[in-house]
């Protein structure tokens, strides 16, 4: 994940004390991250809210299937989509069928002894004028510069599971301060992020703490996503398995906020394995 990559890069660039400072900021809610979300041209997209339609209007089958398949909603079409859940219907404006292409590439594993073994690597290439963005919340001066520095290094080294093969490189196209909105789209996002009125659209895959769970799920519409995986470590030769958790997916709609946590999901005593699970909410009308 992005947070795991930021932790690793912080450790490489600044050492253990800086890493613990970053984790402390997260625990205290002073550094928050959304999931990554797509953009196309000048348009930012939000996860389609997990909310049932109450509209009784008859909709053409082709259009109904097209809307059902949508995963992302343009920011400036969000309110129109929300209204269509109660009356009328939603016709998506022109947007890409997808933001890129999944494909496979054959690579070769060359052992010290024995035959070369081919294997497949799954890849994703973004379409022209498409990419990913995320929202980050800060409370202290200088945090944005620290993040930008880490992202510049990460862009050069890569992010993801195939960095050693040269994949996962990126560059930061722009940095926008949403508390200084400059057009209708950023104005909408700023007000939604500042809103303290339910319902709330969840932008971060995250898990309430045990004592928050019941209250957080009251009246909520949500999906669960399985979070598991392995932890790479310089202290052991093979990756270590991490605890499996089931978290609320981005796009879940909640009536009550929660704090979430930075969970230690390590299954060994080698060192902690942190999983980011703090939410960012948008107050929306649904």
State what each model feature region is:
Residues 1-286:
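Conserved active-site/ligand-binding neighborhood in enzyme cores
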């Amino acid at each position: 994940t992005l947070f795991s990559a930021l932790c690793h890069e912080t450790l490489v660039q600044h050492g253990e004390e800086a890493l613990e400072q970053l984790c402390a900021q997260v625990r205290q809610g002073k550094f928050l991250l959304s999931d990554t979300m797509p953009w196309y041209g000048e348009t930012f997209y939000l996860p389609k809210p997990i909310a049932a339609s109450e509209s009784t209007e008859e909709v053409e089958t082709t259009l109904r299937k097209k809307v059902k398949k949508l995963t992302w909603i343009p920011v400036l079409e969000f309110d129109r989509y929300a209204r269509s859940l109660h009356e009328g219907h939603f016709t998506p404006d022109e947007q890409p069928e997808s933001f890129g292409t999944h494909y496979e590439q054959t690579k070769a594993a060359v052992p010290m002894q024995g035959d070369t073994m081919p294997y497949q690597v799954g890849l994703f290439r973004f379409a022209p004028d498409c990419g990913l963005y995320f929202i980050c919340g800060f409370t202290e001066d200088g945090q944005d510069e620290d993040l930008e520095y880490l992202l510049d290094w990460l862009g050069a080294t890569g992010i993801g599971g195939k960095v050693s093969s040269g994949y996962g490189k990126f560059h930061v196209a722009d940095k926008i301060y949403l508390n200084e909105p400059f057009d209708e789209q950023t104005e909408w996002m700023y007000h939604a992020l500042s809103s303290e009125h339910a319902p709330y659209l969840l932008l971060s895959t995250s898990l309430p703490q045990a004592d928050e769970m019941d209250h957080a799920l009251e009246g909520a519409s949500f999906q669960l996503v399985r979070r598991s995986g392995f932890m790479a470590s310089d202290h052991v030769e093979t990756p270590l398995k991490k605890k499996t958790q089931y978290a609320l997916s981005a796009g879940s709609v909640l009536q009550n906020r929660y704090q979430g946590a930075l969970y230690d999901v390590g299954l060994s005593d080698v060192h902690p394995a942190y999983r980011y699970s703090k939410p960012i909410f948008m107050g929306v009308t649904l």
